[in-house]
Regions:
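Active-site-proximal segment of RNA-dependent polymerases
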Residues: 120-164, 168-174, 408
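Conserved pre-motif C helix in the palm subdomain of viral-like polymerases
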Residues: 101-131, 214-241
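Non-catalytic, polymerase-adjacent accessory regions of viral genome-replication enzymes
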Residues: 1-19, 23-74, 398-430
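Active-site-flanking structural segment that lines cofactor/substrate pockets
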Residues: 69-101
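Glycine- and acidic
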Residues: 101-104, 132-133, 164, 214-222, ...
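Glycine-/proline-rich flexible loop or hinge segments
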Residues: 52-64, 95-106, 129-133
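Conserved polymerase palm-domain catalytic core
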Residues: 79, 92-93, 149-251, 255-274, ...
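Right-hand nucleic-acid polymerase module
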Residues: 113, 117, 209, 213, ...
Length: 430
């Protein structure tokens, strides 16, 4: 494939090439991922891994285990092996975390989603083709690794930083640009490439019960979308890695550092040029340059020297969510003549799940995302105080000093759990 002379990146104007089979292809010595979908031992390994990693609750595991035991995957796996595609995805709007905004996500039928999860699990064999500065959806790499490695790289150095967020990244990926990259990466598995080609070029979905035609990128919400999103910008990641730039990407969030403002501006201009080539847009509300004496924010963390806390943006989002949930519960309790204590208990239960123990094992709670990384608790204290205020508000209907008639012991009796206390408990366990 041709490379552009000025950037070293792929010429994105190319047509999708047909993968070429030949004696040098590793595919002849490997079993296609598509073929593995029909093997019970593959499914059993997949279920065991997800259970070990806490990505199933026991009810979900029992259902999935029964599905595998009766070989419920075989009809769909055989159809895929014969070259058939999946059904149409369903498009829906869901609330963005901590804001009143909506985002578009897609899903397939339950058995199709489970097959896509298995494919995503098996795709980790291509993990070594990504640059070390790409952290999202990598086996053995976490968001905390990005923060720790950045802090180590810039320790003691006055560095400028540029942070950006790609607008609607997953759903904006240009499939005509992605497919040649995918063809190259999956050159050893033509069956898998053709499965993705069919999946990604079917520009139909179901919205509100109606079939609509639209371009939907790699379809946010589907299990294979994170892998495809890593593939799409892997050459950009590699470009900055080869130049020795302190750089990290976690899906649509990117940050890079430079020793002076002019160099940072060059990196920024180059990144904007790359994103234009890939038909992507920067979210202007989430774009920021940090001077050397400022704390930088990335992936919900605020970092300054050796100090790591939750970011200002994270606190603002969570306060918005707490406030909206409290007002909603107050309206509900008034309308249905519910005792204030029940509304207070409802708010506590909701945020206990969000902070510590989600019903969805795929959801990253605060205790899993923030606690292993932060070493400051000011942000947690601020959220604790704000949540307590809103719990008391549900008890009195007012935001004033009368709220303190509901003392802390009453909150604890309703099973309120302090973020700060839980953080120190988790630190002691470690």
């Amino acid at each position: 494939m041709s490379l552009t002379r000025d950037t070293g990146l792929r010429d994105t104007g190319q047509k999708v090439p047909e993968p070429v089979e030949g004696p040098s292809r590793v595919s002849q010595s490997r079993v296609s991922i598509i073929s593995q979908l029909t093997l019970q031992e593959t499914w059993e390994e997949f279920l065991a891994y997800r259970l070990m990693k806490g990505r199933f609750n026991w009810h979900e595991f029992d259902e999935a285990d029964a599905f595998v035991e009766r070989k419920g995957y075989l009809p769909l796996a055989n159809k895929i092996a014969e070259g058939e595609g999946l059904g149409l995805p369903t498009k829906k709007l869901v609330n963005k975390m901590g804001s009143g905004k909506k985002r578009v996500v897609y899903s397939f039928a339950p058995d199709e989603m489970l097959v896509l999860k298995l494919i995503a699990f098996l795709l980790y064999k291509y993990d070594d083709q990504f640059a070390p500065n790409c952290y999202a959806f990598r086996r053995g790499l976490k968001a905390s690794d990005a923060v720790f490695k950045i802090n180590k790289a810039i320790h003691g150095k006055p560095m400028w930083a540029y942070k950006l967020d790609i607008h609607d990244y997953f759903n904006s990926i240009d499939i005509d640009i992605l497919l040649p990259m995918l063809a190259e990466m999956l050159a050893d598995d033509l069956l898998l490439y053709h499965f993705f080609e069919k999946l990604l070029t079917t520009n139909l979905s179901i919205s509100n019960g109606q079939i609509i035609e639209e371009k939907h990128g790699v379809m946010a919400g589907t299990p294979t979308a994170p892998f495809l999103a890593d593939v799409y910008l892997k050459e950009v990641d590699r470009y900055y890695y080869n130049k020795g730039v302190v750089y990290a990407r976690y899906s649509d969030d990117i940050i890079m550092f430079a020793p002076d403002y002019d160099t940072l501006q060059q990196y920024k201009d180059q990144m904007c040029h790359f994103l234009a080539q890939y038909h992507l847009e920067v979210n202007p509300d989430k774009e920021k340059i940090y001077s050397p004496d400022e704390a930088y924010e990335f992936l919900g963390f605020k970092c300054h020297g050796n100090d790591i806390d939750i970011s200002e943006a994270t606190k603002k989002k969570m306060k918005g969510k707490i406030s909206r949930k409290a007002r909603s519960l107050l309206r509900w309790s008034h309308k249905n003549h519910i005792e204030p204590e029940k509304a207070m208990k409802g708010l506590i239960n909701y945020f206990n799940r969000k902070f510590f123990e989600s019903d969805d094992p795929e959801t990253l709670t605060w205790s899993r995302w923030f606690f292993p990384v932060i070493n400051r608790t000011e942000g947690l204290k601020e959220i604790d105080h704000y949540l307590q205020q809103n719990i008391r508000f549900l008890g009195t209907g007012k935001h004033n000093k009368t709220n303190y008639r509901v003392d802390y012991e009453q909150l604890k009796a309703l099973e309120y759990r302090s973020l700060v206390n839980e953080y120190y408990k988790s630190s002691t366990k470690e």
